[in-house]
Design a protein with these regions (language model features):
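N-terminal Rossmann NAD(P)H-binding glycine-rich loop of SDR-like oxidoreductase domains
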Residues: 5-22
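Adenosine-cofactor binding site in Rossmann-like domains, unifying the SAM/SAH pocket
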Residues: 27-47, 67
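Conserved amphipathic alpha-helix within the SDR
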Residues: 42-53, 73-74
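Conserved NAD(P)H cofactor-binding loop of Rossmann-fold oxidoreductase domains
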Residues: 56-65, 87-90
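Catalytic loop of short-chain dehydrogenase/reductase
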Residues: 77, 81-122, 134-138
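C-terminal helical subdomain
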Residues: 130, 145-177
Length: 177
């Protein structure tokens, strides 16, 4: 089985990649740190081509998520494959006193959640799991003085939910510590 994952070299993406490798999956990763920036057209084309024989697409990197989700969905429409979409609990809860630097992030994640809902209305397949964790223990949010979820716990949950995709339909999971 093959997993295509964005943002696979840090944080949740790194931990999730390692979990899938431990389960015997082949990983094809896209990350700024391996010169596979998912906002560049040549990288996007490579990713879409890579998804033709993949079973799972983990839409983890913040950049270009809605566009990638839509393109992979169109490629896989009607096929028994799975998109694991990493959104944010920040779209569900009402946070207070957040820095303005997060406004674009919040807007992008809300757009992503809307895109998920619209695509699900088109077809039940591919499966789309929308995972919305709150703050995750990563360097990116180390400056925020708030409770954070261990990325290993989230990755374990995601793998478990993927394995249950035929038993229950996973639509939206909001995780908060």
């Amino acid at each position: 089985m093959k997993v295509v994952i964005t943002g696979h070299m840090n944080g949740l993406g790194l931990v999730l990649s390692n979990k899938f490798v431990q389960k015997g999956y082949t990983i094809s990763g896209y990350d700024l740190n391996n010169d596979k920036d998912v906002i560049k057209e040549d990288t996007i084309n490579e990713l879409i081509t890579d998804c033709t024989d993949a079973d799972i697409f983990v839409n983890n990197a913040h950049a270009n998520q809605s566009s990638l989700l839509t393109q992979v969905f169109k490629l896989w429409e009607g096929m028994d494959k799975t998109i694991i979409n990493i959104s944010s609990a920040i779209t569900y809860i009402t946070p207070r006193n957040l820095p303005e630097s997060l406004n674009e992030y919040i807007s992008d994640k809300k757009n992503l959640d809307t895109t998920v809902k619209l695509l699900r209305m088109k077809s039940e397949l591919p499966h789309i799991m929308n995972i919305r964790p709150s703050w995750i223990e990563t360097q990116l949010v180390s400056e925020f003085n708030t409770k954070k979820i261990n990325p290993d716990d989230i990755a374990n949950l995601i793998v478990m939910l993927y394995n249950m995709r035929y038993a229950v339909k996973i639509l939206d999971i909001v995780l908060e510590k």
